[in-house]
Amino acid sequence: MVTIRLSRGGAKKRPFYQIVVADSRSPRDGRFIERVGFFNPLATGKAERLRLDLDRVNAWVEKGASLSDRVSALVKEVQKAA
């Protein structure tokens, strides 16, 4: 099954997440199919906190991909802001 989920990057105690489309059997930070955005929970000032390609997310959901809980909340946040 294909899921849209967060993949952790960044330094120790300073997380930075890529929003990726991946097979649910692959490791959290492992192989992915497509990168559809990023999420920076520690963004301050003019730094961009969240970027998401909603067209690609919707295309993957139409193909049967499921959203993780956190990504689902982020998608709703982007849709509310738009």
From Swiss-Prot:
It comes from the Bacteria. One of its GO terms (cellular component) is cytoplasm. GO terms for biological process: translation. Signal peptide: none annotated. InterPro entries: Ribosomal_bS16 (IPR000307), Ribosomal_bS16_CS (IPR020592), Ribosomal_bS16_dom_sf (IPR023803). One of its GO terms (molecular function) is structural constituent of ribosome. Belongs to the bacterial ribosomal protein bS16 family. This is Small ribosomal subunit protein bS16. It comes from Actinobacillus succinogenes (strain ATCC 55618 / DSM 22257 / CCUG 43843 / 130Z). The lineage of its organism: Bacteria, Pseudomonadati, Pseudomonadota, Gammaproteobacteria, Pasteurellales. The gene is rpsP.
